[in-house]
Amino acid sequence: MTPSRGAWGVVGVDEAGRGPWAGPVVAAAVVLAEPIAGVTDSKRLSARSRERAAALIRSEAVAWGVGRADVTEIDALNIRRATFLAMARAVAVVAETSPIAEVLVDGREIPDDLPAPARPVVGGDALEPAISAASILAKTLRDAEMVLLDEAYPGYGFGRHKGYGTAEHRRALEELGPCPMHRRSFAPVRRLLGG
């Protein structure tokens, strides 16, 4: 038989956290047997709807995996390469338990070191159910991590803005300076460090 969508191993991959000034970049990889009702691009869902959808994905997906690149890796590699590393890690988790025929990656580029043929899908988080599912998992898992970082590093508001460059975050950086979770390679943080 020839591989096809669903249980035969078409993996959707997406990330969350490329743009924030703090925290990791998180990627998810998902194999679906069939589309799951209510699962669409994570940016189109409320936080509550994303959480419900994430629970459905975790229970109904044929396979799923998560990869991340932390702040140290982001600063050492750059955000593009760190994102690809997180994606490759997520796909590797899926590959441990599920055969992979093809990897569909949201965006214009694909990582080099994937265990199967891959292709980019521009706007894939709205077009491909497996990428939509990956988008939701990556976003909910990263958001949960940022809430924990808010407790570990109070005063920055990570639980509210999730590390993105809001006015609140800018004020906190100016008042407190960067914490270990800030991406020193990002211009707003680098400027505060005198770079």
Swiss-Prot record:
InterPro entries cross-referenced by the UniProt entry: RNase_HII, RNase_HII/HIII, RNase_HII/HIII_dom, RNaseH-like_sf, RNaseH_sf
Catalyzed reactions per annotation: Endonucleolytic cleavage to 5'-phosphomonoester
Binding site for a divalent metal cation: 14-15, 106
GO biological process per UniProt: DNA replication, removal of RNA primer; mismatch repair
One GO cellular component term noted in the UniProt record for this chain: cytoplasm
Broad class of where this protein is predominantly found: cytoplasm
Pfam families, per the entry: RNase_HII
Keywords: Cytoplasm, Endonuclease, Hydrolase, Manganese, Metal-binding, Nuclease
Cysteine pairs bridged by disulfides in the record: none
MF (Gene Ontology): manganese ion binding; RNA binding; RNA-DNA hybrid ribonuclease activity
Keyword field contains ATP-binding: no
UniProt remark on cofactor binding: Manganese or magnesium. Binds 1 divalent metal ion per monomer in the absence of substrate. May bind a second metal ion after substrate binding.
Protein family: Belongs to the RNase HII family.
HAMAP family reported in the protein's UniProt record: RNase_HII_B
Described purpose of this protein according to its UniProt entry: Endonuclease that specifically degrades the RNA of RNA-DNA hybrids.
Protein name, per record: Ribonuclease HII
Upper lineage: Bacteria, Pseudomonadati, Pseudomonadota, Gammaproteobacteria, Chromatiales
Gene: rnhB
